[in-house]
Amino acid sequence: MNRLIRYIGVGKYIQEEFALDKAGEEAILLGRKAFVLGGKTALEVVRDKLEASLAEKGISCEFATFTGFCSPEKIDAYTELFLESGADFVIGVGGGRAIDTAKGITYRTNACIMCIPTSVAQCACYANVIILYRDNGDPLPYAWNLIQPVNVILVDTDIIVRKCPVRMLSTGIADS
């Protein structure tokens, strides 16, 4: 019996020092207006460089701060903000919960996505599933499988090395 094994992988993976400087040239292939979703700290770390890189290519952006857990209800709420913003693609920034929620927007809308991790203690950028929780943080007994892959992952090693908390760095190394 022949079995077809289907794997959805990432379209493009870039890992280098100052990779964030390339965000604009990668994003221009995805759209003209970005909806950027990330945690408070992650957005503080990347916002200025990301905004400048996007602006160089004429890409506007709207930022939204992620809080809480990646739940179906939270995904629906951020999807509404994405649709209201008029953006045509998503940029997820930060750790696993924020990235999974950004992927959830694309799951709902079929929009393109770029992921920018700020911690190595997660694999959400590359994983083709969205791990879901209840709003109180309890895990749901199921996950959503992505219909389309993440388009671009930008891993800026300068951010990972200099800005990532040591506990997250050691957790990520141990997890690998």
Question: Predicted segment positions?
Answer:
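A short, small-residue-rich loop immediately preceding and capping a beta-strand
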Residues: F82-V120
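Short glycine/serine/threonine-rich phosphate/pyrophosphate-binding segments
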Residues: L20-D21, A42-R47, R97-G104, Q122-Y126
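Short, glycine/charged-enriched secondary-structure capping and boundary segments
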Residues: K49-A52, Y78, I105-R108, N128-I131
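Short C-terminal domain-edge/linker segments immediately following a structured domain
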Residues: T65-C70, V93-G95, Q122, A143-P149
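ATP/NTP phosphate-donor binding region
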Residues: M1-F89
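Glycine-/small-residue-rich active-site loops that bind phosphorylated ligands and cofactors
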Residues: A42, F69-S71, R97, V120, ...
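A glycine/threonine-rich phosphate-anchoring loop and its flanking beta-alpha core
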Residues: G11, Y107-S176
